Amino acid sequence: MLSPKKTKFRKQHRGRMKGSASKGNTIAFGDYALQATEPVWLTSRQIEATRRTITRYVRRGGKLWIRVFPDKPVTARPAETRMGSGKGAPEYWVAVIKPGHILFEITGVPQKTAQQAMKLASYKLPIKTKFIVRNTIES
């Protein structure tokens, strides 16, 4: 599963997810993409489950790009622990996703295959997503 090798600080504030994505909201590598339509914290487990679903569906066919990385630590306290005595230890990692962010990109497969792969992948995610196609300008 994805997680940073080294971070400057072990713990972070939760923060807020205001507005829509200003970066990472256009297709950069592939021909087809899965785009988030809601704000969410995507865990490294959810990203991995989605990646496995897409790669299993397209087999040796296309190339897949994961456009999100879980770089925010989420802390949790042990069960049945009294309040106080500081913040809990980091439990898992999340990627902060805003509406409009591209999650996965794929190329090298027919559009129907890519669309079905992304549909199956979207079932692994806790948000609504949409399938988008790169705008190719032929000259």
Curated annotation (Swiss-Prot):
Residues 1-17 have a biased composition (Basic residues). SUPFAM superfamilies: Ribosomal protein L16p/L10e. Its main location: plastid. Residues 1-23 are annotated as: Disordered. GO terms for cellular component: chloroplast; mitochondrial large ribosomal subunit. GO terms for biological process: mitochondrial translation. It is found in: Plastid, Chloroplast. Keywords: Chloroplast, Plastid, Ribonucleoprotein, Ribosomal protein. Pfam families: Ribosomal_L16. It comes from the Eukaryota. InterPro entries: Ribosomal_uL16, Ribosomal_uL16_bact-type, Ribosomal_uL16_CS, Ribosomal_uL16_dom, Ribosomal_uL16_sf. GO terms for molecular function: rRNA binding; structural constituent of ribosome. Part of the 50S ribosomal subunit. Belongs to the universal ribosomal protein uL16 family. This is Large ribosomal subunit protein uL16c. It comes from Porphyra purpurea.
